Each structure stands twice: as structure tokens, then as C-alpha cells.
């Protein structure tokens, strides 16, 4: 017979208040207590919205307005469970509130799904690297990978390979912005010093001179081109569903994007590591050089590379930043978090919703009335 699980910790209202006074952000759902201190800065609605509810019952907030929290959001909450609220025999004035909390009921149909997360009973062993394990999940992989967890991930046994699979956010501008500046300067000089003609390889008679002013247009075109690449890769490659009988395609999907959906707040896996990024960037450079005149392709590539840098920085900020309510980034953060927690088959734009509008993959608006 398996040993009985240890009893849940319990806290009196006075103990909860002491933690709140020390700066912690505890909330409750009925009599269940959750320590959201480490999650406050990640909350898609902003820090202040969560801090304003410290010490309060959030049961009604989970159902909205402004929106009803998804099943994944409720599972996520359970990872922060710390115990139960209990009466204090030394302070009978608080016991009425405790009794009220204990009698509050949650949806009985949902309650069994959202018990305290038991890492020992998950489909994988979290004490070991995950990559080889996920390939064995088969038909269970797709559901498992879209149930996010609040913990870091290890992919490989080898420390060296593991190091190449992660990076810090600031490696992206440090490595790629100098290359953007160099390419931009180099190709701009080519425009000013050489007689660059468009379509010269096809016909000399109808070829056109390229003035210096075309640089800005081509550079911006490259940035726009990146937003399209971002959308296409995210939708059709990262969100492909690997065959359940293919061990290696499941592993490939997990390396490319599944790991990010499983652990969306693992900061070391939010931006593209330099080594694999170099291979992808080199591919696009060669591709543009092959299909376009060298200078044209080079300028578009430089703009696209800057677009990639802005995309990766935006992506990191959407996960870890706290944009002002009503701002562009605030709306993009809410949009992206919904993609992670509820709408994995829509909302593929990260730096812009442009292509979601164009291809009709916008996340639907909720019908809840606006908060006053």
C-alpha cells in the first residue's frame, strides 16, 4: 500500500497577515492558500492587479471579468499552493472569516483536475533530462506539452550541449546588433559608391539605377519580411503536431518549441541560443543572396536581422516585463499569454498581430463586460 500523502500545511489569518506585511503576495481560493510572490511580475494583467488582491479570495476573479481564466491557468495556480486557512483558537474574532472561507465551494466538475501538482506522478521524471523521455509519451505528448509548469527544464545529460541550448536575453543584441550595423554600413556604402542597377542581370536596356534613398525602403521591407517569417515559422513549424508514433519527431518538436510551451517562464530558454540561431540566420542570408541582387538581398537581410532582434527582445519582455496598462506591449502580452495558456492554435504573432489579422488567426475576444 502506498504511504498516505502528508497533511497539508495550515495557517491562521494572523500568520497570513504577517507574511503579507513582510511583502509576500498570498491569495486564497476558498480556504486554500497560494503564495504568488514569485509570479507577481509575470502576471499578464500587471503586477498591481495581483498585488491589489493580496490576502483576498480570488475565486470570483478566476471566472472574470475581465476574463475567465483557462483550465491551464487554474492548474498553474495549484503549483503555488502552500496550505489551508485554519481558525486560530487564540483569536476568535478571525474565526468567522475562516468558517466562511471553508464553506465556499468551487465548481465540483473542475475541482479534481486542480489538486496540488505532484511532480513524482507526472508522465516524466523531472529529476532527469527531458528530451529523451518526451519521445516516449506518444499520444499523450500533445496534451502534456500544452499544460505549462512553473519550473526550469533540463534537456540533455551533457553539460556542454545543455549550455548551448540556453542563453541569456542580452546575448541577442550583443551578438547580432553589431552585425546589423556592419551590414547596413557596408551595403549603404555600396549604394553610394557603385552604380547598382536593378534587373541588370536580365536586361541592360530596361535595368534601373538604385539611388541611395532606396536603402531605407529595402531595410524596412526586410523588417516586415521578418514579421512574416516569424508568423509562418511559429504557426506551421513550431505548432505542427508530431506523429504520436514518431519518437524522434516528438523530440524535435520539443527542442524547437514544445519546451517553451511546457516551461514558458524559464528565462534561459526564451530567446534563440546563438549557436542554432547562427545556422538559421546563415540560411536566410544565403537564400536572399541567391534570389536577389547582392546589395538588395544584403539590405533586406540586415533589416530582417534587426526585425529578429526586436522580436526576441519583445518575446522576452512579454514574459518577464510589466508594460503599462493599455499600451501596445500590454495588449501583446495579454495576447501572447492567452496563446500559451488557452489558444495554442491561434495568436501566432508575437511582435505584431498583423499576420494574425491577415490569415484570420486572431484570438477571439471574450464576452465578459469590462471592469469598472
Swiss-Prot record:
The record's EC number reads: 1.14.18.-
For the ligand (Zn(2+) 1), the binding residues are 234, 239, 257, 261, 339
Do you know which SMART domains this protein is assigned to?
Cyt-b5
| Transmembrane portions of the chain | 168-188, 213-233, 268-288, 290-310
Tissue specificity here reads: Expressed in brain (at protein level). Detected in cerebellum and forebrain. Expression in the white matter is mainly restricted in oligodendrocytes. Expressed in stomach, kidney, skin and testis. Expressed in sebaceous gland.
The chain positions of domain Fatty acid hydroxylase read: 219-361
Q: Which membrane topology term applies here?
A: Multi-pass membrane protein
Q: Which GO terms describe its molecular function?
A: 4-hydroxysphinganine ceramide fatty acyl 2-hydroxylase activity; fatty acid 2-hydroxylase activity; free fatty acid 2-hydroxylase activity; heme binding; iron ion binding
The record's InterPro entries line, in alphabetical order, gives: Cyt_B5-like_heme/steroid-bd, Cyt_B5-like_heme/steroid_sf, Cyt_B5_heme-BS, Fatty_acid_hydroxylase, Scs7
**What keywords appear on the UniProt entry?**
Endoplasmic reticulum, Fatty acid biosynthesis, Fatty acid metabolism, Heme, Iron, Lipid biosynthesis, Lipid metabolism, Membrane, Metal-binding, Microsome, Oxidoreductase, Sphingolipid metabolism, Transmembrane, Transmembrane helix, Zinc
* Main function: FA2H is stereospecific for the production of (R)-2-hydroxy fatty acids. Plays an essential role in the synthesis of galactosphingolipids of the myelin sheath. Responsible for the synthesis of sphingolipids and glycosphingolipids involved in the formation of epidermal lamellar bodies critical for skin permeability barrier.
* Similarity comment: family membership: Belongs to the sterol desaturase family. SCS7 subfamily.
Q: What is this protein called?
A: Fatty acid 2-hydroxylase
Organism the protein comes from: Mus musculus
Its lineage opens with: Eukaryota, Metazoa, Chordata, Craniata, Vertebrata
Tell me the name of the encoding gene: Fa2h
Amino acid at each position: 500500500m502506498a504511504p498516505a500523502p502528508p497533511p497539508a500545511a495550515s495557517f491562521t489569518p494572523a500568520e497570513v497577515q504577517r507574511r503579507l506585511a513582510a511583502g509576500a503576495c498570498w491569495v486564497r481560493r476558498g480556504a486554500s492558500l497560494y503564495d504568488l510572490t514569485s509570479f507577481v511580475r509575470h502576471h499578464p494583467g500587471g503586477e498591481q492587479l495581483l498585488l491589489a488582491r493580496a490576502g483576498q479570495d480570488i475565486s470570483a476573479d478566476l471566472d472574470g471579468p475581465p476574463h475567465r481564466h483557462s483550465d491551464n491557468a487554474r492548474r498553474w495556480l495549484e503549483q503555488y499552493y502552500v496550505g489551508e486557512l485554519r481558525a486560530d483558537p487564540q483569536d476568535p474574532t478571525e474565526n468567522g472569516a475562516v468558517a466562511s472561507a471553508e464553506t465556499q465551494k468551487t465548481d465540483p466538475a473542475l475541482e479534481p483536475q486542480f489538486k496540488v501538482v505532484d511532480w513524482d506522478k507526472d508522465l516524466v521524471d523531472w529529476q532527469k533530462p527531458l528530451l529523451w523521455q518526451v519521445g516516449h509519451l506518444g499520444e499523450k505528448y500533445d496534451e502534456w506539452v500544452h499544460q505549462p509548469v512553473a519550473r526550469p527544464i533540463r534537456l540533455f545529460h551533457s553539460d556542454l550541449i545543455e549550455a548551448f541550448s540556453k542563453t541569456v536575453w542580452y546575448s541577442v543584441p550583443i551578438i547580432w546588433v553589431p552585425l546589423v550595423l556592419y551590414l547596413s554600413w557596408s551595403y549603404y556604402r555600396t549604394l553610394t559608391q557603385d552604380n547598382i542597377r536593378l534587373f541588370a542581370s536580365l536586361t541592360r536596356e530596361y535595368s534601373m539605377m538604385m539611388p541611395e534613398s532606396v536603402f531605407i525602403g529595402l531595410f524596412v521591407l526586410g523588417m516586415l519580411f521578418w514579421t512574416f517569417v516569424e508568423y509562418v515559422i511559429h504557426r506551421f513549424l513550431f505548432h505542427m503536431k508530431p506523429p504520436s508514433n514518431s519518437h524522434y519527431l516528438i523530440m524535435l518538436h520539443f527542442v524547437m518549441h514544445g519546451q517553451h510551451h511546457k516551461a514558458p517562464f524559464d528565462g534561459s530558454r526564451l530567446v534563440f541560443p546563438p549557436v542554432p540561431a547562427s545556422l538559421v540566420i546563415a540560411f536566410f542570408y544565403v537564400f536572399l543572396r541567391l534570389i536577389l541582387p547582392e546589395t538588395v538581398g544584403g539590405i533586406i537581410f540586415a533589416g530582417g536581422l534587426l526585425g529578429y532582434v526586436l522580436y526576441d527582445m519583445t518575446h522576452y519582455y512579454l514574459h518577464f516585463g510589466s508594460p503599462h496598462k493599455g499600451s501596445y506591449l500590454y495588449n501583446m502580452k495579454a495576447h501572447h499569454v492567452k496563446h500559451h495558456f488557452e489558444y495554442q492554435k491561434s495568436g501566432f504573432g508575437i511582435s505584431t498581430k498583423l499576420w494574425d489579422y491577415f490569415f484570420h488567426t486572431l484570438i477571439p475576444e471574450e464576452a465578459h463586460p469590462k471592469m469598472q
